[in-house]
Amino acid sequence: PAKGANVFWKCMACHAVGEGAKNKVGPELNGIIGRKMGSIEGFNYSDTLKEHNAKGDVWTAEILSQYLANPKGYMPGVKMVFAGLPKEIRADDLEAYLKTFNADGTK
C-alpha cells in the first residue's frame, strides 16, 4: 500500500479517500473495489457510468486496472481526463492502497 499511496498523489487533484472524503472533480474512492459503478450519491457521472450502474456492474481489481491503463479507451464516454497510468507504475500498487479504505473511509 505504501507505493500506492505515492501513486495516489496524482489522483488527489480530482479524487479523495479517507474519513470525511468528499466528491471533487471526480467521485470519492472509498471502498471502490467491490462497489457498484456510478453509485456515489451526489456525483454527476457520465452516461457511460450511469449505464454500467443500471446493469449492476461492479468495480473489480481487474476492471479498475484496465480502466486506469486507458480510461477513455476502456470505457468510451467517461468524463475522466486522466490519460492513464504510465507503464512503469503498477496499477496493483494503487489498488492495494485503495483497498485499505472501507466504504466509510475508515481503514
Curated annotation (Swiss-Prot):
Q: Fetch the SUPFAM superfamilies from UniProt.
A: Cytochrome c
Supply the Gene3D superfamilies for this chain. Cytochrome c-like domain
Residue ranges the record marks as coiled coil: none
What post-translational events are described?
Answer: Binds 1 heme c group covalently per subunit.
Q: Which keywords does the record carry?
A: Electron transport, Heme, Iron, Metal-binding, Transport
User: Where, in this chain's numbering, is heme c bound?
Assistant: 11, 14-15, 80
What are the boundaries of the signal sequence?
A: none
MF terms from GO for this chain are:
electron transfer activity; heme binding; metal ion binding
Q: Which Pfam families match?
A: Cytochrom_C
PROSITE patterns for this protein? CYTC
Q: Which PANTHER family match?
A: CYTOCHROME C
Q: What's this protein's name?
A: Cytochrome c-550
Say which species the protein is native to: Ancylobacter novellus
